[in-house]
Curated annotation (Swiss-Prot):
Host defense peptide that exhibits antimicrobial activity against both Gram-negative bacteria, such as E.coli and S.typhimurium, and Gram-positive bacteria, such as S.aureus and B.subtilis. Inhibits cell adhesion of E.coli on intestinal epithelial enterocytes. Causes rapid permeabilization of both the outer and inner membrane of E.coli, leading to morphological alterations on the bacterial surface. Binds to bacterial lipopolysaccharides (LPS) with high affinity, and may thereby be involved in immunoregulation through LPS neutralization. Disulfide bonds join C27-C54, C34-C48, C38-C55. Residues 100-123 are annotated as: Disordered. It comes from Pan troglodytes (Chimpanzee). Residues 65-123 form a propeptide. The lineage of its organism: Eukaryota, Metazoa, Chordata, Craniata, Vertebrata. Residues 1-19 form the signal peptide. Keywords: Antibiotic, Antimicrobial, Cleavage on pair of basic residues, Defensin, Disulfide bond, Secreted, Signal. This is Defensin beta 118. It is found in: Secreted. Its main location: secreted. GO terms for biological process: defense response to Gram-negative bacterium; defense response to Gram-positive bacterium; innate immune response; killing of cells of another organism; negative regulation of cell adhesion; negative regulation of lipopolysaccharide-mediated signaling pathway. The keyword Signal applies. The three-dimensional structure formed by the three intramolecular disulfide bridges is indispensable for antimicrobial activity.
């Protein structure tokens, strides 16, 4: 008897807590629910049986969009944008030389204008 008294309130409150248990029917391509009043964030899209409203979440677009294939880029005709998007690569060349190479080149160009200094060793 105690078990029956505990189970009775649970069965009475269960439809109010769980919406699917109360038997709300799906509507509007199975994206909405038939309710007496729509909740916040839902919009009325249609009417269900027993004077209930078909409530659909208003933040989603439930229309079916036809699938289209993207247009390949090769079919498009060339235009100004193609000229703008064309990137030309340029490479700059640099010569790298050391100071030793520069001294040797400068001495070769001048010839032997300078003589070696005389070094005197005194003991």
């Amino acid at each position: 008897m105690k078990l029956l008294l505990l189970a009775l309130p649970v069965l009475v409150l269960l439809p109010q807590v769980i919406p699917a248990y109360s038997g709300e029917k799906k509507c509007w391509n199975r994206s909405g629910h038939c309710r007496k009043q729509c909740k916040d964030g839902e919009a009325v899209k249609d009417t269900c049986k027993n004077l209930r409203a078909c409530c659909v979440p208003s933040n989603e677009d439930h229309r079916r969009v036809p699938m289209t294939s993207p247009t390949p880029l090769s079919d498009s005709t060339p235009g100004i944008i193609d000229d703008i998007l064309t990137v030309r690569f340029t490479t700059d060349y640099f010569e790298v030389s050391s100071k030793k190479d520069m001294v040797e080149e400068s001495e070769a160009g001048r010839g032997t204008e300078t003589s070696l200094p005389n070094v005197h060793h005194s003991s």
